[in-house]
Amino acid sequence: MERPQNRGNDQMRTVRIIPGFQKYPDGSVLIEAGDTRVMCSAMMEEKVPPFLRGKGSGWVTAEYSLLPSSTETRTQREASKGKISGRTSEIQRLIGRSLRAVVDMPAMGERTLWIDCDVLQADGGTRTAAITGSFVALYLAFKKFKEQGIIETIPVKDFVAAISVGIIDGTPILDLEYIEDSQADVDMNVVMTGNGDFIEIQGTAEGTVFSRAELDQLLELAGKGIQELIALQKTILGV
């Protein structure tokens, strides 16, 4: 099959991570994956949720939103609806889980790190881009806190990144754009650590089924892409 921009089946879109994109957050980036653009920021709050009070542990949580003009037809702000959608809630939880898996939260002290992900332009893979970019914003924030003497060490146990994979017309492909995602027989989001361990696998078939062999192919593709993303994260962070 021929892909947009004549990408190979195992080739990601061009990814850029621009650190320090905002003035006020403790850490921020703009991540671009092809035409998808997500602004990720990290800000510290000197308290934790009630269930963690007095336990000497920190917390990492995330919020996610689509700007109205990020999509081809205007997306209504969820604030004007009075509640967030199930999709938004799912993505927020996914981002938070992915980051907490690699953070030593007792080393944070009783503080909450808020991650905000705002999609400026959506062309597929916004949740995976949000995870990949948010990790860099989180690391930058922790680095700042260590330099300021707020924490003793950078409480990060491993790197984390995410990518989409799918099957179209029987062909496994890496990093789906929206036009590909909308016609995929199988669509999957994969979150992995730098050590190659899995944090989350979200995969579904539409109107068909997929085999164990195809699942293994997809996970192999995802692992390749995620290692490339983590190499980029390390370059940006200078580690």
From Swiss-Prot:
Keyword Hydrolase: no
E.C. numbers: 2.7.7.56
Gene Ontology MF: a single term: 3'-5'-RNA exonuclease activity
InterPro entries linked to this entry: ExoRNase_PH_dom1, ExoRNase_PH_dom2, ExoRNase_PH_dom2_sf, PNPase/RNase_PH_dom_sf, Ribosomal_Su5_D2-typ_SF, RNase_PH, RNase_PH_bac-type, RNase_PH_CS
Catalysed transformations (reactions): tRNA(n+1) + phosphate = tRNA(n) + a ribonucleoside 5'-diphosphate
Entry keyword annotation includes Phosphoprotein: no
Enzyme class: transferase
Sites where the protein binds phosphate: R87, G125, T126, R127
Keywords: Nucleotidyltransferase, RNA-binding, rRNA processing, Transferase, tRNA processing, tRNA-binding
GO BP annotations, alphabetical order: rRNA catabolic process; rRNA processing; tRNA processing
Function: Phosphorolytic 3'-5' exoribonuclease that plays an important role in tRNA 3'-end maturation. Removes nucleotide residues following the 3'-CCA terminus of tRNAs; can also add nucleotides to the ends of RNA molecules by using nucleoside diphosphates as substrates, but this may not be physiologically important. Probably plays a role in initiation of 16S rRNA degradation (leading to ribosome degradation) during starvation.
Family stated for the protein in its record: Belongs to the RNase PH family.
Subunit note: Homohexameric ring arranged as a trimer of dimers.
PANTHER family listed in its UniProt record: EXOSOME COMPLEX COMPONENT, EXOSOME COMPLEX COMPONENT RRP41
Protein name, as recorded: Ribonuclease PH
Lineage summary: Bacteria, Bacillati, Bacillota, Clostridia, Eubacteriales
Gene name, Swiss-Prot/TrEMBL: rph
